[in-house]
């Protein structure tokens, strides 16, 4: 099927001007995830904040009740007993100076990054590499911690980091098209709840302004913001 015809087909039945209840939006998106691979279901939340101001930054981490459906590779910067704990918890890559050198050389074999507090002077050198990828460990989201085992298990088990982008948007994957619709709805509501709890003091007016759900290759479906709470 030609790409144009395919896009026309999957867009049929979606009113681009309508705001759908969350459960209906998820159903529409799932029905149109027709690729040969298991597409990721993604959510975009437009917030009434200006992240250029420090008091309007929104970031955090949420444990999705039904996981993400992704295999997440976790890297841990730790030494000694903490390194052993990380390995036992299932970390894919564990190291100290050696791991710093690997990352500096461009070998990033992980999707999420965790560090013990004592490692941060070393890990701080990697800001230019890990920062743009959104992978820099941060105590505010639990990725700089002495509980490396808990952090590794969380990352593997469905925790999702979120951070508002320059345009005031938070985007996150909340599961796979193969998930039951009610499981996706639960995950989306958990994300929205975490975003609400992370509302900064500097936010004025309507906080959650627009919400849309889509699949990797499918069209976006606009959601009634009030139905995600």
Curated annotation (Swiss-Prot):
A Pfam family: Ribosomal_L1
Keywords: Repressor, Ribonucleoprotein, Ribosomal protein, RNA-binding, rRNA-binding, Translation regulation, tRNA-binding
Source superkingdom: Bacteria
SUPFAM superfamilies xrefs: Ribosomal protein L1 (SSF56808)
GO MF entry, a single one: structural constituent of ribosome
GO cellular component, one term: cytosolic large ribosomal subunit
GO BP field: regulation of translation; translation
Role of this protein: Binds directly to 23S rRNA. The L1 stalk is quite mobile in the ribosome, and is involved in E site tRNA release.
SUBUNIT field: Part of the 50S ribosomal subunit.
Family of this protein: Belongs to the universal ribosomal protein uL1 family.
Protein name as catalogued: Large ribosomal subunit protein uL1
Source species of the chain: Rhodopseudomonas palustris (strain TIE-1)
Native organism taxonomy: Bacteria, Pseudomonadati, Pseudomonadota, Alphaproteobacteria, Hyphomicrobiales
Underlying gene: rplA
């Amino acid at each position: 099927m030609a790409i144009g015809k395919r896009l026309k087909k999957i867009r049929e039945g979606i009113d681009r001007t309508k705001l759908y209840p969350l459960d209906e939006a998820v159903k529409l998106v799932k029905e149109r995830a027709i690729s040969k691979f298991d597409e990721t279901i993604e959510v975009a939340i437009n917030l009434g904040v200006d992240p250029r101001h420090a008091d309007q930054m929104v970031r955090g981490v949420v444990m999705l009740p039904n996981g993400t459906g992704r295999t997440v590779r976790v890297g841990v910067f730790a030494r000694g007993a903490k390194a052993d704990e990380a390995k036992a918890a299932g970390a894919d890559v564990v190291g100290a100076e050696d791991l710093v050198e690997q990352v500096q050389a461009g070998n990033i074999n992980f999707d999420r990054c965790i560090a013990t507090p004592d490692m941060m002077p070393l890990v701080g050198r990697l800001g230019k590499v890990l920062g743009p990828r959104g992978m820099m460990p941060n105590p505010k989201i639990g990725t700089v911690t002495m509980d490396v085992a808990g952090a590794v298990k969380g990352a593997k088990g469905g925790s999702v980091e979120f951070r508002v982008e320059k345009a005031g948007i938070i985007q996150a994957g909340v599961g796979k098209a193969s998930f039951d619709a009610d499981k996706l709805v639960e995950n989306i509501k958990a994300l929205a709840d975490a975003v609400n709890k992370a509302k900064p003091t500097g936010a004025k007016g309507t906080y959650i302004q627009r919400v849309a759900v889509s699949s990797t290759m499918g069209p976006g479906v606009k959601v009634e913001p009030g139905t995600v709470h």
